[in-house]
Amino acid sequence: MSSLQCLKKVHLEIHRKDLQVFSSDTERAFAIGHEVGDMAIRLYGQGRGVEVQYDSGLARALMTTEELMASGAQEPIFEATLEHEGVLVREDVLLSVDSGSDWRIVEVKASTKVKPEHVLDCAIQAWVHRGAGHDFESISLAHIDNQFRYRGDGNYDGLLVENDLTEAVQKELPTVPHWVEEAKEAVEGPMPDIPVGAHCTKPYKCPFMGYCWPNDTDYPISGLGGSRKKLGLLVMNGHEDIRDVPPSEISGAGHERIHRVTRAGESE
């Protein structure tokens, strides 16, 4: 998914992971995601099912998944690990249909609705699933029902609601090989020259922003706040410090005020 946000990002994830800095909001989102994932195991498993462990290494996780699927497992498989053409996925919930002759894939998100990036994520999972030699009957996204009310006694039934994305995913599948090829080229070749912009925070805040955005100055452009697209254009025009930006390139009352105050060196 990283490559769909920014090819430079996926290159850095492989070659310069040391440059990553996760914001407190991102760390909190990770924690919530893990909690929702644990709840999905509880809700879909109902005390049953097998979670594929990753602490014994990738090879073992892949082997365990294949063994479980080959056995026609009737119980849910959690974190099923599959690989195809160098692309690795871990399926949150994998449910057997017709004693393992077909499968139902469920991706779980700590969101309250289906977002465009979720469809792309599911498309990649479906492509790997099929490429690894397995068919699927359907692929769905389970997200939090924002109308859910907890009534006590540890009963969270109804917390997650499923949306069938099979049709939307099928439309994206022909494009997945192109995405994969682009990602491989970005990883194996020199770092892509991608300018900063709105994609730095959408759909997720990039942990490499501190590296890509100019910050070796007293008043970096990011200090203007607001639209990353507008700030990215200023950086593309060669500006690193707020004080160096000509007034003609500043728009919007908020940016104009910050620009004036910063250049004047005193508050208004």
Language model features with spans:
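Metal-dependent nuclease catalytic cores that hydrolyze phosphodiester bonds in DNA/RNA
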Residues: 1-101, 220, 226-266
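Conserved structured core elements
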Residues: 34, 116-119, 123, 225-228
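Long, highly charged amphipathic alpha-helices
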Residues: 35, 39, 124, 175-182, ...
